[in-house]
């Protein structure tokens, strides 16, 4: 077996050979692809076997997933010291999880008595009958695994789950927050059945019968339910805790019988995850184990501020479990942790590792769900895997949101004072003050302000390099070879959202290399992508490419070389199969239940018209040719065969489709005038914060954290993507946000980029050749020294200034000066920038690049009301097209759109 160094050397040699081939591929996306080349490309796209291994914790990876030469995402060279929670797993549960059907018959023959005992089968059962019953247990266990887990959990998990009506693979998707709750009484209320943890206070047979009587468990096997109940009651430390309190109660009942009748029965409580530092002289537990302590108090005084408490009383109320509680995970997922035990908590750390830092929840989860050769029930639990991955991520995000809520001032959220003032003015209350305010900063990944910031950064790329030429949508193919090769026995791709996310990430990186470094569609000047998720959670990426001027797509011939919208001929059967499988849209009267159908019309505007020649029209995507050449492909819908021709083909590129065997839609967008709407589509998100009035209308509350959570949808592939901290957006160039004075805390003397710019102009005559926004292309900003330094590497950064309202005239004119004067030493007025309406034209022209029609009309109204332009009529006529472009786009009628926009402008 080769050593790690030998393996690394072999991989590097392969990469060198591949890079040599890549140099020949510049623009090869414009070639006709042969059958032989299609097969060669598919082999190049193969990620290889998952045979790379972390030397510390033995997690398995594709070689392309390594971070540098030695780092992996699993253990951070220290987390391997965390005890393996699955090391001593009950044998019968392990067999149920692994469902090794192939070896079952032989194993039962050889060890019949053992299997009869493990699965509580009748003593006289023969091997054939035992095999049949156990195989039925396997099927039932995995079909209803979420129900079995919920039935045996000590704590409940609840949230709004999304229901899917149409057929498709399983997807667990939640909307809003997830809650974990524990019954706070040992016995149920009168005439109610015990639930969750209360079931462990009754005997096994009764508990199993109660579980089976629940409507949700009607399809579960009573025998399997009883079997799992007996295992959990025998193994779980939480079940042991319930026995402790039962023993203490029985002991106190006997003592009370012998005591003075006037003495009240003592108060008995059980506390999970109890504080080890409790004063033992004051709070002396009657019994204790590793997760719980039972207290008896004659005066009713028990420890306070404990997370989870169970009282010796009847009731139906629940206590919420904090996400920081170390028992939460084991209480919610008894099938994964049948022995109980502790999970992540804020104080978790590894001695002498990670430079003394505590282990984050994200690191803990990544380590737990990494793929290894050792047994891990999480990765073979199919539907329950979806649930716990979503639960993991929601908990991680909840921790981050809590930090933001508690540290608003430290995070300089006072930068958003203008928003608070606006809310005060709009409140109309006798006490118009902002109440509990939580503003999500732009650093919160996935939040509305994060997406808006990156949309503005993307528009800065457009101002620097021009409009994008190609809009590529790359969708994950769950049937990729790499996914299927690494499925465990009896699994389907939908059962492994972790594999789906990992393979898609690796393929996306490879695709971006082909597009940007190799340039298979042409030489690229700038690029960006955003990762999103389909309704059922399948990941896809929206990619925008800005081509070099020498590779721009300008003629119908250029369109034909890059994009095709026709079914390939039978000469290349492999490509034909790829296109007919991935790139043919199917809807219409023969398939009215297709997701794209609304009011019996396809929202994607299929079928298209037959076109003999490609066209490039201003204002829309280029239209590739769709010849009526007789090529068709068959689809079966609801038992009926329908034939689809070139009118139903989604535009694609032969090279990319051949290599990646996936849905890769390639659209030529260079002719679109209102390109900002393409960027708006790519950077979808919340446009504004939700606002909520208090019940007494006395104060107005702005809680962006709650609004974000309430509006959020999370599926398992997305949750896994975020747990692994993969980028949800990326672009070719960094964008330096350049400050104005308002963004600088008036109480601080620290320099901003603006002050550093002024200092740079004094110290470096070379810098006076550049505008403020051009400085980041030639200088880097040193955060520590608060000054600009000459850039040593190739330019991969551009500058962007925040947009300033004309109402704030001092900042507006400062910004105007910085945008149009190199090395400024005079005011905007002295420069002659304010002598006519030119500053308003500049403002509207800049805003039209990234603001919507609605926002532009509001800006135009502000100019009219606040700035009194000398010629407002001509100013309106000059920008009438952009002021009305949203309504023209919606109505598809120029005159009507302009009328609606003008009416709105009058009411602004």
Which ranges hold each PLM region?
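Extended, structured polyanion-binding interfaces
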Residues: 1-908
């Amino acid at each position: 077996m080769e050593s790690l160094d030998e393996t690394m050397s072999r991989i590097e040699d392969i990469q060198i050979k591949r890079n040599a081939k890549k140099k020949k591929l510049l623009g090869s996306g414009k070639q006709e692809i042969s059958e032989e080349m299609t097969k060669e490309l598919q082999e190049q796209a193969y990620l290889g076997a998952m045979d790379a291994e972390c030397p510390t914790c033995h997690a398995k990876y594709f070689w392309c997933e390594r971070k540098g030469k030695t780092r992996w995402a699993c253990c951070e060279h220290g987390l391997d010291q965390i005890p393996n929670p699955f090391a001593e797993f009950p044998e019968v549960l392990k067999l149920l999880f692994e469902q090794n059907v192939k070896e079952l018959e032989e194993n039962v023959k050889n060890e019949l008595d053992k299997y009869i005992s493990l699965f509580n089968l009748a003593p006289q059962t023969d091997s054939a009958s035992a095999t049949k019953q156990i195989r039925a247990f396997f099927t039932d266990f995995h079909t209803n695994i979420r129900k079995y887990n919920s039935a045996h959990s000590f704590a409940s998990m609840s949230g709004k789950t999304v229901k899917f009506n149409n057929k498709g693979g399983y997807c667990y998707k939640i909307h809003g927050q997830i809650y974990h709750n524990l019954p706070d009484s040992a016995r149920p209320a009168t005439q109610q059945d015990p639930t969750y943890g209360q079931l462990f206070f009754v005997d096994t047979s009764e508990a199993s019968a109660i579980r089976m009587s629940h409507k949700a468990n009607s399809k579960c096997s009573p025998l399997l339910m009883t079997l799992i109940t007996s295992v959990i009651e025998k193994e779980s430390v939480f079940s042991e805790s319930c026995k402790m309190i039962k023993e203490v109660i029985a002991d106190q009942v006997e003592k009370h019988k012998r005591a003075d009748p006037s003495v009240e029965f003592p108060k008995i409580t059980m506390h999970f995850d109890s504080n080890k530092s409790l004063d033992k002289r004051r709070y002396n537990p009657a019994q204790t184990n590793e997760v719980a302590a039972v207290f008896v108090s004659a005066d009713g005084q028990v420890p306070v501020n404990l997370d989870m408490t169970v009282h010796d009383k009847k009731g139906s109320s629940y206590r919420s479990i904090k996400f920081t509680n170390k028992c939460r995970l084991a209480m919610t997922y008894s099938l994964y942790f049948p022995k109980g035990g502790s999970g992540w908590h804020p104080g978790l750390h590894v001695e002498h590792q990670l430079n003394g830092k505590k282990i984050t929840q994200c690191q803990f989860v990544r380590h737990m769900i990494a793929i290894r050769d050792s047994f891990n029930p999480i990765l073979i639990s199919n539907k329950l895997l979806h649930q716990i991955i979503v639960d993991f991520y929601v908990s991680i995000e909840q921790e981050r949101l809590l930090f933001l809520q508690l540290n608003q001032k430290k995070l300089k959220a006072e930068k958003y004072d203008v928003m608070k003032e606006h809310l005060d003015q709009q409140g109309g209350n006798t006490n118009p003050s902002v109440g509990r305010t939580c503003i999500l900063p732009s650093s919160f990944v996935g939040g509305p302000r994060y997406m808006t910031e990156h949309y503005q950064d993307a528009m800065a790329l457009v101002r620097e390099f021009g409009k994008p030429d190609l809009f590529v949508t790359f969708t994950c193919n769950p049937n990729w070879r790499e996914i299927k090769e690494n499925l465990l026995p009896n699994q389907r791709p939908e059962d492994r959202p972790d594999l789906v996310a990992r393979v898609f990430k690796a393929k996306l990186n490879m695709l971006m290399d082909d597009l940007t470094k190799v340039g298979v569609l042409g030489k690229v000047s700038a690029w960006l992508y955003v990762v999103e998720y389909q309704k059922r959670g399948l990941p896809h990426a929206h990619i925008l490419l800005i081509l070099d001027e020498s590779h721009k797509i300008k003629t119908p011939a250029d369109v034909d070389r890059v994009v095709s919208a026709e079914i390939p001929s039978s000469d290349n059967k492999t490509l034909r199969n790829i296109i007919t499988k991935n790139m043919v849209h199917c809807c219409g009267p023969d398939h009215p239940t297709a997701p794209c159908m609304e009011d019996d019309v396809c929202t994607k505007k299929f079928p298209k018209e037959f076109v003999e020649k490609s066209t490039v029209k201003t204002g829309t995507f280029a239209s590739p040719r769709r010849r009526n050449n007789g090529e068709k492909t068959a689809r079966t819908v609801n038992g009926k065969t329908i034939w689809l021709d070139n009118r139903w083909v989604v535009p694609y590129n032969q090279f990319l489709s051949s290599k990646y065997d996936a849905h890769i839609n390639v659209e030529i967008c260079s002719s679109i005038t209102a390109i900002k709407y393409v960027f708006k589509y790519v950077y979808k998100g919340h446009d504004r914060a939700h606002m909520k009035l208090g019940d007494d209308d006395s104060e107005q509350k702005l809680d962006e954290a709650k609004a974000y959570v309430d509006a959020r949808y999370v599926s398992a592939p997305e949750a896994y993507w975020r747990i692994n901290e993969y980028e949800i957006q990326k672009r070719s160039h960094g964008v330096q946000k350049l400050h104005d004075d308002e963004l600088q805390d008036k109480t601080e003397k620290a320099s901003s980029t603006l002050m550093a710019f002024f200092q740079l102009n004094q110290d470096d005559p070379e810098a006076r050749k550049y505008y403020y926004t051009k400085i980041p292309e030639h200088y880097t900003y040193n955060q520590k020294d608060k000054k600009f330094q000459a850039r040593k590497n190739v330019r991969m950064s551009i500058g962007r200034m925040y947009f300033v309202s004309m109402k704030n005239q001092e900042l507006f004119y400062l910004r105007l000066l910085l945008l149009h004067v190199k090395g400024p030493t005079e005011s905007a007025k002295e420069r002659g920038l304010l002598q006519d309406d030119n500053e308003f034209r500049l403002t509207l022209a800049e805003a039209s690049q990234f603001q919507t029609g609605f926002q532009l009309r509001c800006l135009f109204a502000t100019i009219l009301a606040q700035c009194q332009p000398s010629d407002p009529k001509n100013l309106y006529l000059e920008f009438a097209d952009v002021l009305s472009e949203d309504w023209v786009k919606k109505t598809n009628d120029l005159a009507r759109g302009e009328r609606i926009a003008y009416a709105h402008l009058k009411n602004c």
